[in-house]
Amino acid sequence: MRYYLDAAPIIYLIEQSQPFATAIRSKLAAPGIVPLPSELARLECRVKPMRDGNQALLQDFDDYFANTIAEIFPLKRDVVDLATEIRAQYNFKTPDSLHLAAAVISNCDIFMTNDQRLNRYTGIIIETI
């Protein structure tokens, strides 16, 4: 089962934000679960540590994406086109629309996020943490 990871679940994991980190780790450790973020999630995770000059946290994120994640989904034209449709129909923010489109195009089964507003989207199962 492929789990698309929005940036928030990754941030919770790396920063050990409880009780979220334990719940996320438990879900992702289940047999057959493949976590799949996109390049957008990688970007979003890296901004705050970079802005704050927190090299240790930035390295933790870089290590996670390099060593724990087997695949980072690229944002190509098909993702952007679907994101445009999602944004037009649901009026979500552009990053949220890109995340949802990436999850659908990459054939993920579940979209993991902390954003309850995204539950309105019907193109994939949304799991809110």
Predicted features and spans:
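Short, high-confidence coil segments that cap the C-terminus of an alpha-helix
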Residues: 32-33, 92, 106-108
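Acidic catalytic patch
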Residues: 67-89
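Conserved glycosyltransferase catalytic-site signature
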Residues: 7, 39, 96-100
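Short, well-structured N-terminal submotif of metal-dependent ribonuclease cores
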Residues: 1-37, 50-63, 116, 127-129
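Acidic, PIN/NYN-like endoribonuclease modules and their adjacent C-terminal/linker elements
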Residues: 1-2, 71, 100-129
